Structures are given as C-alpha cells and as structure tokens.
Amino acid sequence: SPEGAASILYKDAGQVERAAEALRIVPMNPAQDFFSAVQSVWLMEMILSCVTGGRDFAFSRLDLALLPFFDAAESEDAQEILTEFLLHCNNIGGMGSELHVHMPVPCAATNIYLMLGGRGAEEALALDLCFLRAALEVRLPQPVLALRQCKDSDSRWKIACAHAAQELNGQVSLYNDDALIPNLIALGMPEEKALHYTMSGCNRAET
C-alpha cells in the first residue's frame, strides 16, 4: 500500500501521510508539487539501480527538471526534502550484485552523479544553492556533486561551489563550461545538447 511504502522512508506521521499522498500519484502520473516530484525521481532511480546492476548512474539535469515545482519562497521546506533525498542516495549502493542475475556487479558502492549550475541553468540558481546546502547537511559520499561554472556565473554560485569543494572534499568536482561546451560543439554535438551536458561515469560527458 502507499502508506506501507511511505513508512519505510519517513518516521514522522505527517511525513508519512505526505509521502503516501504523493505515492497515490507518482510515478505513474505527473507530479503536482516539489515533494511529489522528488519522490517520483527517487522511486524511479531506486528501481533502475536495482534493475541495471546498481553501478554508476546520473540524475542528468535534475535541477532543471525540478525547477517548475520549486518555489524560492519555500526554500526551507525544499531544502529539507532535498536533504532526505540525498540521504536516501546512500542507501542503494551495491544492490546490483544481489538483485540483477543477468548483469551482476559485485560492488560495495554505487557512484551517483548530480550535475548542478552552469550555462543554461541560470534560472535554477536558488534551487542549486538549496541542493548545496542540503549536501552540506548530509555530508555523505553520494551523490558526487558535479558543479558547472563559467566566467559569467553568479558570484553567489562561485562562492558556494568553493565552499562546498572545501567542506565536502572528494564529493565535489568542478567543470568549466567555457572549456567544455565549445569543445563538445567542435566534436559535432548540437549547441543545445552541449549546453545541457551532464556526467555519467567517472569523467564522461553526456547529454
């Protein structure tokens, strides 16, 4: 039941009811708010991780996908939701070796990549900063934060990225859009796709 599934993830009665209500809608139907959107992403990523072997995957441009549901005026609630989301990303490592008989991956950990910021995501600044604050609360290995910057990046983003890199050590990688995007275009990638590149695997750029 939705209530049973929700109670696995949430202890507070109000959170359980909120999660149960979201599970009546997502992921079968479109999300209706920020909470149900994040819940839908988590459920799909957890299932895909089990099915495909539980090893190295990325959320693509999750900030842009969640942006239509994000209200900067309610960033405190959004940060709490994202904190729970990032915590759960550390619960699914290594399951592929047990659950996928066709492609078992005997790994003790799964690397998950979350790309934030950069060209084409300027309107997501408040949400991206919220993600970083949540990561600083969690301070666990996953997801790996792939933080995009360019010379025109907002100073608040540059400072927040520098702080995250200092505080979270190996969890943060910085990517230079001014170098990567022109090179992706030179390799034949359409400009729109190059603008929204993300990371998959240790250092592979994809769209």
Protein language model features and the residues they cover:
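Conserved catalytic cores of very large enzyme subunits
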Residues: S1-T207
